[in-house]
Amino acid sequence: MNLADFFAKRRDQFPALQRRRNGMQSVFLDGPAGTQVPQCVINAMSEYFVRCNANHGGLFDTSVESDRWLDESHQAGADLLNAADPTTISFGQNMTSLTMSLSRALARTWKPGDEVIVTRLDHDANFRPWILAANDAGATVRIVDVHVDDCTLDLEQLKNYLNERTKLVAVGCASNSVGTINPIAEICQWVRSAGALTFVDAVHYAPHRAIDVQAFGCDFLACSAYKFFGPHLGIQWGRREILEDLLPYKLRPASDDLPGRWMTGTQSHESIVGTMAAIDYLVSIGKELGASHSRREHLETAFSAIERHESTLATDLIQAISELPDIRIWGISDPARVAERMPTISITHSKLTATEVAIQLAKSGIFVWHGNYYAVELSELLGCEPEGMVRLGIVHYNTSIELERLIAALRSLSG
């Protein structure tokens, strides 16, 4: 099957992709900051409001039906992450707020002399919460550096930091800034051998590859639905025994059972249901491509196809940008190493600021982000502050024709 044609046909399911500027369809390369949503997500959220817009735990019809949908959404989240227990899936305002909450609870177990490890490759949501928590507990923070030439983690330094005092290692599956993929399963094994816990930020990984908390061997993992074609919502998974043992900051009437003890206040039920719809949109890709039976198997089939399609687009884009004057690709720029990175390509122009490049692309109907994307430590390390970089984010609904328009627009910058 021609995957380019297969995914091009799916564009019709995304109403926003029909947007036009200057008589041409807009090109959405802003996915790393938030993807567009398919019609099925819009329908699910609207249907929730119509059918069962009620609070949790009531004995009347709409509340009972609402709770059923929420339970189904927890199962969908478990299938997405390959978690064995749906009650270990928590929903929240966003990944940042969930991480802040968890960091507060973990900090209660730390003391002076304990150590926490973070990295300069991460989004600040997987950096600052742990710094603040460690400071409150009097714990020491170790920061893993990044190889500037290809923006990969200094894994030897990470291993050397691990010792009997290490309590937690916070690391990302993939960089939201330069696309680097980290060897998560290997890192988690090192951390586990040291007797510490691992928190994994999978936000940037989620729309591109299948997440598997069992294969990763992590203790906690968080991602965001709006990065994988859903609404603005955060998702967090943790090992059941740890989630039950920790003391979260919560209100007295709130449930002490999972998942309620980690879901502060009244949730956005419509967003939770919309997240299930986004997961089932991905499932529909797998159903169309294979003969699997379970939701998880369909997801694995879908992400296998998504990875192949996006890798082809990313390889072609990296090769084309490499031939343009005045433009630098940050991170892994060898097309032969595309398997080590996400299809997220950040660039700078030697004669124009990131802001100027983004403005010119926007005038051409090409939507990209510029700045540091909250990966503050990395942007500073690379010397890209205060302007940052221009980020070109491919997801499965992008096409080679769109990338040809992008290359033409970038070429005109040096004209």
Give the location of each predicted region.
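Pyridoxal 5′-phosphate
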Residues: 1-415
